[in-house]
């Protein structure tokens, strides 16, 4: 969408996302969702297999991945900040119980409360992975996907709040929601910094959780969301004359 110029002549960008019942109930809405930043890494251990009777002839990929995982758990940033690093895949070895695997694969899910913190976290993670070479193995890695954190326009959020007030009233309008989740919506403001963007948080009595296989929500919220966005756009047009 961005590369094809779909937002080149846009001043504002308004999005919407349902929120779980722990955050918002039906007929409640938040003036913005402050998503965190996220990154996903795939890593590989390169080596030669060895026989179980001759472990000195190879480097055990399982040991290397274990060392990396321990190193990741010893990354400490500012305690006031929200961040996390989790190993989500670890594969090494095969069906033969007497073979020490020289090759392995691992994946990481990395999250931080903002883009600056994510960049700092990425550097620390890369240092941990590269340090594993001290065991004598070769490692490689690639960041396969990055989702930027929210860059919310205060002006856009003010208009969103006015739209919520028109539909739900003061008592059903909440302030910003901060979440460790991420969303592709925020690529727009990274690629086009002049865009004034904000995402509406919409209550739907959604449970047990977002993206859960048995997720359920009250579908009546959909038209509420449409009306809030309509009122928000009308407020912008009124302001611009």
Where are the regions that the model predicts?
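Histidine/acidic-residue-rich, glycine-tolerant segments that coordinate divalent metal ions
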Residues: 1-84, 94-99
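Metal-dependent amide/peptide-bond hydrolase catalytic core
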Residues: 63-241
